[in-house]
C-alpha cells in the first residue's frame, strides 16, 4: 500500500511548524486508499474523513490556540510519525502547535547575537568594597573557591567585576557582532552569583549604582547593544529585605514577624524556622505560586524600575517554577513598556510541549514567551561533535522545525556554554570527566586536549551561528576560557592572555551572520545528514548559503553543481575536502 506524508514539506502541510489560530492549514496525504485523520486536543479527539483529490486526500483545518496531536488511518493501518517525521505504521503522533493570533516576537533580536556576562567576572574598573560576610578577592583571574575552610559552600567571594568595567569593554563586545548582552543577576544580594536577591529595586553595590547602570545601557544603545535582565522571581535570598532572616535590613521581613507586609509572599509550616525553599536550600526561600501581592510588586515596580533603567529584555530564571498566569502578567507588563521588549524563559526541554509538576505549560500555545534557552540543541550539537554521528542533531532539528512557531524558532537562544554548564572547550577537549567538584579546581586541559577542544569548539559554533535561532556566547568562550561546573565555569575573563585565534574565528562567523539576511529568518533545509557529514542551507535562490561540516573520522569530498563562493572554511587545500572537524560556508558565486 502506498502512503506518504511529511509535515515539514509544504506539499503535505501548507504551513510548516506552528500554526496561527483560526488560519487555514491544509493536510495532504498521498494514498491509494481512503484516509481518516484523527486530531487530538488536550482532552478529546475527532475523526474526519479526508477528501479525495488527484494523487491522494486532503483536509483543511482552522483551530483555536492549543496543543494538538494527530495521526492517520488508511486500509486498516494506523500511520504516525517515523524518526524522519515521515509517515510509518506506528503509535507515535505528530505534534501541531497552534499559537494565538496576536502572538509575535521582536524583530530586532532575529539575526542577532547574544553575549552572556557573569557580572563579577567580566571586567573590573576601579576598586570596590564588600559588605558583612563577604570576601574580597584581589587576585583577578584566581580560581573561585568552591568550599570555605569550614566545608560550607558560601559563594560569597567577589572579584569586583562591575558596570563600569562592562561599559569600558563595549567596543570589544561590538566587535563580536553582539546585539544583546544577557547579564546574570545584578540586584543587591549576598552571593556573587546573585540568584539570592536581597533587594529587587537596587543594583548590587559591588557592581555600582543605578546611575552607573543607566550609563551602561545608554552607552550600549549608542552601539546598538541592548541589555537583558535576569529576573529571579521564584525565590529570594533568606537575607533579603523581604525575608530578613539575618536582620540586615531595617524593614520587618516575613521571617521576623507574621505581621510583615511580606509574610504573604512565603510559605511557613512553622514560623519562623520551617519554611519552603528552593530545592531545600534554606538560603533561598521560595515565593508562593499564587501570591498576588508579590506578582503585583514584580509587574508594577520591578519591571518598571529596570525598563526605566534601560533594559530591553528579561530572562525568567526557572520559569517552570512560575505559574503560566504569572508569566502572562510579566509579559503584559514588559510589553506595555515597549512592544519589542524581549522575554526569554529558562527551559531545558522542548518548551512547546513541556510538562512541569503535572501541568502542561502554555509557553507558546498561549503566547507567553518570545524565546527559551535552547538546551536540546546544545545537547545535539555536542553529541554530534563528540561522537561524529549526526543522528541526534538531525532529529532535534526536525523536531524543533515541526513544533515551534516560525517567529519563535528564529528567536531561540542557542547556547553552548552557560553559567550552569561546563565550558564548551573543556567539555569537548578533555579526555576524562572529573565528577568531584573539589578536584575540578585543578582540572586544566593539556596541550593536546586544548587543541582538540578548540578545533571542536569551532565546529560547534558554526552550527550555533548558522542554524535557526540566535547564538548566545558565554563570556570568555571566544578566548578559550576553561572551566568545569559552577563555580569553575565562572572564572574571570583573561584580558591579557586570551586565545586571539579563537577570538578571530568568532569575529569571522559573526561577520558572516550579520552580513547575510538569510540568518535572520531564512528557511533552513537539511541537505545531507549521514554519519559525520552534515550539510544544510539557509535561504533560497541567489541568497542561499550552504554550510557543510564533518565531525567524522574520515575525509569527505564535496561536489557542487554550480560555481560557488567560499565565505569561510578551515580547508587545507583548494579541493572541497572536509577533513575531520572540517567546515565550509559557501554562497552562490556572483
Model-derived features with residue positions:
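The feature marks proteins involved in alpha-glucan
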Residues: 1-28, 43-116, 122-146
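Active-site-proximal helices and loops of the catalytic beta/alpha 8
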Residues: 217-226, 235, 240-251, 302-304, ...
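Aromatic/acidic polysaccharide-binding cleft in carbohydrate-active enzymes
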Residues: 120, 358, 414-445, 461-499
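Conserved, mostly hydrophobic/aromatic
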Residues: 117, 173, 183, 200, ...
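Substrate-binding/active-site clefts of carbohydrate-active enzymes
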Residues: 118-179, 186-309, 330-337, 353
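Beta-strand-rich binding/interaction modules
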Residues: 34-44, 68-70, 554-571
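C-terminal beta-strand-rich structural cap/linker in extracellular carbohydrate-active enzymes
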Residues: 574-590
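Carbohydrate-binding surface patches
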Residues: 14-19, 23-26, 32-33, 526-561
Amino acid at each position: 500500500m502506498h502512503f506518504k506524508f511529511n509535515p515539514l514539506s509544504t506539499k503535505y502541510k501548507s504551513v510548516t511548524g506552528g500554526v496561527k489560530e483560526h488560519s487555514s492549514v491544509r493536510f495532504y496525504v498521498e494514498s491509494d486508499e481512503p484516509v481518516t485523520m484523527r486530531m487530538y486536543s488536550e482532552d478529546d479527539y475527532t475523526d474526519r474523513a479526508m477528501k479525495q483529490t488527484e494523487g491522494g486526500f486532503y483536509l483543511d483545518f482552522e483551530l483555536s490556540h492549543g496543543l494538538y496531536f494527530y495521526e492517520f488511518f488508511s486500509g486498516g493501518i494506523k500511520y504516525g510519525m517515523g524518526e524522519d517525521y515521515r509517515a510509518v505504521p506506528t503509535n507515535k503522533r505528530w505534534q501541531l502547535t497552534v499559537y494565538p493570533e496576536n502572538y509575535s516576537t521582536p524583530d530586532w533580536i532575529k539575526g542577532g547575537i547574544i553575549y552572556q556576562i557573569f557580572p563579577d567576572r567580566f571586567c573590573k574598573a576601579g576598586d570596590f568594597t564588600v559588605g558583612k560576610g563577604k570576601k574580597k578577592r584581589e587576585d583577578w583571574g584566581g580560581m573561585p573557591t568552591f568550599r570555605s575552610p569550614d566545608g560550607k559552600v558560601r559563594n560569597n567571594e567577589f572579584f569586583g567585576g562591575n558596570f563600569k568595567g562592562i561599559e569600558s569593554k563595549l567596543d570589544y563586545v561590538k566587535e563580536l557582532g553582539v546585539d544583546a548582552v544577557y547579564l546574570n543577576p545584578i540586584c543587591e544580594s549576598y552571593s556573587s552569583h546573585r540568584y539570592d536577591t536581597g533587594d529587587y529595586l537596587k543594583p548590587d553595590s559591588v557592581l555600582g549604582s543605578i546611575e552607573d547602570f543607566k550609563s551602561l545601557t545608554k552607552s550600549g544603545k549608542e552601539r546598538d547593544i541592548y541589555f537583558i535582565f535576569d529576573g529571579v522571581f521564584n525565590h529570594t535570598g533568606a537575607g533579603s529585605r523581604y525575608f530578613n532572616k539575618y536582620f540586615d535590613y531595617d524593614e520587618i521581613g516575613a521571617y521576623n514577624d507574621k505581621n510583615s507586609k511580606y509574610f504573604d509572599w512565603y510559605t511557613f509550616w512553622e514560623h519562623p524556622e520551617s519554611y519552603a525553599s528552593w530545592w531545600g536550600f534554606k538560603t533561598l526561600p521560595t515565593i508562593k505560586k499564587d501570591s498576588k501581592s508579590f506578582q503585583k510588586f514584580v509587574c508594577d515596580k520591578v519591571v518598571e524600575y529596570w525598563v526605566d533603567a534601560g533594559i530591553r529584555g528579561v530572562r525568567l530564571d526557572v520559569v517552570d517554577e512560575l505559574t503560566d498566569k504569572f508569566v502572562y502578567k510579566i509579559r503584559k507588563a514588559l510589553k506595555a513598556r515597549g512592544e519589542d521588549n524581549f522575554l526569554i524563559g529558562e527551559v531545558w526541554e522542548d518548551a512547546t510541549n513541556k510538562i512541569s509538576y503535572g501541568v502542561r505549560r502554555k509557553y507558546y500555545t498561549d503566547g507567553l514567551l518570545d524565546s527559551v534557552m535552547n538546551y536540546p540543541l546544545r545537547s545535539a550539537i555536542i553529541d554530534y561533535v563528540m561522537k561524529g554521528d549526526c543522528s541526534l542533531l538531525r532529529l532535534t532539528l526536525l523536531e524543533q522545525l515541526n513544533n515551534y512557531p516560525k517567529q519563535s524558532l528564529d528567536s531561540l537562544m542557542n547556547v553552548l556554554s552557560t553559567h550552569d554548564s561546563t565550558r564548551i572547550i573543556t567539555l569537548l577537549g578533555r579526555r576524562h570527566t572529573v565528577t568531584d567538584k573539589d578536584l575540578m579546581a585543578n582540572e586544566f586541559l593539556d596541550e593536546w586536549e586544548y587543541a582538540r577542544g578548540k578545533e571542536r569548539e569551532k565546529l560547534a559554533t558554526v552550527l550555533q551561528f548558522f542554524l535557526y535561532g540566535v547564538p548566545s556566547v558565554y563570556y570568555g568562550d571566544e578566548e578559550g576560557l576553561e572551566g568545569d561546573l559552577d563555580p569553575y565555569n565562572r572564572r574571570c575573563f583573561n584580558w591579557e592572555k586570551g586565545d586571539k585565534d579563537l577570538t578571530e574565528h568568532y569575529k569571522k562567523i559573526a561577520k558572516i551572520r550579520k552580513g547575510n539576511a538569510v540568518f535572520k529568518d531564512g528557511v533552513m533545509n537539511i541537505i545531507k545528514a549521514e554519519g559525520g557529514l552534515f550539510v544544510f542551507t539557509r535561504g533560497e535562490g541567489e541568497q542561499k548559503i550552504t554550510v557543510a561540516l564533518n565531525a567524522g573520522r574520515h575525509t569527505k569530498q564535496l561536489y557542487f553543481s554550480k560555481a560557488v563562493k567560499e565565505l569561510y572554511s578551515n580547508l587545507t587545500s583548494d579541493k572541497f575536502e572536509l577533513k575531520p572537524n572540517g567546515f565550509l560556508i559557501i554562497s552562490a558565486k556572483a
